[in-house]
Amino acid sequence: VAAVRPHPVLNEQDLDQLMQQFPDALLLALDQVTDPHNLGACIRTAAAMGVQAVIVPRDRSASLTPTARKVAAGGAEKVKFIQVTNLARTLAHLKETTHTRVIGTMLDEKALPIHQCDFKGPVVIVMGAEDTGLRPITQSQCDHTVYIPMSGDLQSLNVSVAAGMALYEACRQRNSL
């Protein structure tokens, strides 16, 4: 049996280096997603879609526990995992230094159907917490908000499912499938 050494948990400085290496990066940010199963599923999908990094706040978020790694099914070894002190400040920094567009997923009066949003170039897709969605401070950093149109009576998805759908649309537009 071969032992796989997991990637270390990275921080804000590592994110700056990553953006220099991948100027058109596709990133996934999770705003206070606390369930390690959801974190693992998001990481697995991010790895499958070629996302360069998953960004989470250091506090009030799930961390890369053995459960999250197991659910990620190898994805935690493929995609960078970055814990930041302040997610809103990190998003503002990305916008200022690398012209990364921040696209939040939420249902509000300004939100576009996800397929109408341009995901080309450097982009970070931000998913909100399982029960409360995006915090107002995180919303304030979003250049655009999008929603996933649904035809059923239930207008809610699990965060990992919604992340998968958002990442698929981004990759479809970026011709990276």
Model-derived features: where do they sit?
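Structured adenosyl-cofactor binding patch, chiefly the S-adenosyl-L-methionine
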Residues: A48, T67-G75, P136-L177
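RNA substrate-binding interface of SAM-dependent RNA methyltransferases
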Residues: A3, Q17-L112
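Active-site/ligand-binding-proximal alpha/beta "capping" segment
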Residues: I103-L154, N158
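Glycine-rich nucleotide phosphate-binding loop and flanking beta-alpha elements
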Residues: P8-L10, P36, A62, E109-A111, ...
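Short, structured active-site "lid" loops
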Residues: V1-P8
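N-terminal accessory regions of nucleic-acid-interacting proteins
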Residues: N11-D16
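Structured loop/turn residues at secondary-structure junctions
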Residues: H7, D59-R60, E130, S151
